[in-house]
Every structure is written in C-alpha cells, then in structure tokens.
Amino acid sequence: RVTENLEPLDRYLDEKKAKRRHRVRRYMTRPVMSTYLKTEVLGEENVKGLEGAFILVPNHSSHLDAPMVFSLLPDWITEKLATGAAADYFYRKRGISSLTSVFFNTYPILRKGKRESVEHGKAAGMTGRLLRAGVPILVFPEGTRSRSGKIGQPKAGAAALAMQVGVPIVPIAMLGGHEAMPVG
C-alpha cells in the first residue's frame, strides 16, 4: 500500500505533544522575540471564531517570520499549528529538523528545482493530509524568503489546496522582519 511509507500524523495530532511544544514556545520563543522586537498585531478580530483546519499564509522575508507568527498570534491559533518547512534547507541535518520541529511543529515541503531530502518521500502530500485531519498549517506561499524585503510572487499551491480541501486561508502581512534579520 502507498500509505505505508508515508510519515505518520501522530505527532501532529497528539494533544500532549501539542501542549509541550506550546510551552516551549511560550517560555522560550515569546520572551526572546519580545526582548528584541517591538511588535504590533492588527486585525486579530478578523479571525475570532476560526476553528479547525485553516491555512495561514504570511509573506516571507526573514528567518524571524515563523517565530513572529508563533509569538504574536493567540494561543488558540498556534497551539496545534504545523509549519511547512523547506525540505532542502531545514531537513538537511537531523539536528536542524528536530529543533525546528520542537519550536514550529514543522514538516518537510519539497521546493521546485531544489534537491530532495531523504525525508521528502515519507512526507508526500503532508499538507493536504494534515488539513484533512483538522490540523491548521502555516505555509509561506512565496516559497522562499524575499531578498529585498518586498513581498514576492506567491505560488498557487496554498490557494489550490484550500479550495480542494475546503478550508479557509488567513492572509498575514508581516513588516519589519527583513530589516531585523535580512537574508544572508
């Protein structure tokens, strides 16, 4: 069977693991982010009542983007949130993938034209599988960080998947990440 080789969804669905990841972020990520960045969240009222699976789609200009999302959004949005991470970048070494997994509940995404990681075959279709299981996801639709800080051209994948699975998309505009920690 094809599904026998796929990455199990257990760790993304396990309540105890979600609570542990959440505590790590609350007591480590949030204090670090609030120490170094002055932040402001606008429009939180637009997501009141959002539940179940959805796709968060922020622009991507810095390695600070995922920590900002997890630090600034309400707990009820981020507690079970899984993050699509570039397989060729974050899954090259087990230590990096383990660390990002603890902090951001990551799963590998293969980017077009990039070298496949060993993990990719097991994670095929992971975004759709997570959404169908009720797990909200965070993906950066540009597919990579902006080199200039300007919003890049989004790929169609998140929108196509949202329509296919029938989940809402929550756009997020993030400003200042590139200035605080530019690419390179």
Q: Could you describe each region identified by the protein language model?
A:
Residues 18, 35-184:
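Soluble catalytic domains of membrane acyltransferases
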Residues 9, 24, 99-100:
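Generic structural signal of hydrophobic/aromatic residues within well-ordered alpha-helices
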Residues 12-25:
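Helix-enriched interaction subdomains in cytosolic or periplasmic regions
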Residues 24-33:
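N-terminal nucleotide/polyanion-binding subdomain common to many enzyme families
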Residues 4-13:
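A short, surface-exposed helix-loop junction/capping segment
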